Amino acid sequence: VLYQNDDYGKDYLKGFEDGLGDKAKTMIISKITYEVTDPTVDSQIVSLKASGADTFFNITTPKFAAQVIKKAHEIGWKPTQYLNSVSNATGSVLVPAGVDASTGIYSAFYIKDPTDPQFQKGKEWDDFVAFMKKYHPTGAMNDNFNVYGYTVGQTMVEVLKKAGDNLTRENVMKQAAN
């Protein structure tokens, strides 16, 4: 496991270990941290390879995730890789890391991937494109985080529509939960 040495990384690791339960002690053979100020995580990847790990959980942020994927590929380390949802954006992580290097990595995300042609059609896509052109014309259309921001904003729009003129905290929370 590679994780950021702060509350974000430690909390993500704790959740992972909690999920593994008693098996965590035997399944995780190496836990290595990095600092957000580190220029690269190359040395950490070399150390993880040297540990003999055949499975790797990448709990990093996008910049470091791309470095990890690329470095593991460069040094021939081919563990089964799991990438956290924070860093699985195709356009800003996987492509910069290299398509060959990114092939076979497991991850999950809860929004449509803007680089996937099957999602680049229909009213939702057209609305997203129109929004980006109007409000964020320099934004990358292939960036999951732009899609995420848009979907969060649209969720709030729906909540406020349902709340109508009754914009009390109680009613807004009621509509959000409904």
Question: Which positions does each model-derived feature cover?
Answer:
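Extracellular/periplasmic periplasmic-binding protein-like sensory domains
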Residues: A72-G149
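Extracellular/periplasmic Venus flytrap/periplasmic-binding protein
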Residues: V1-I75, Q118, K123
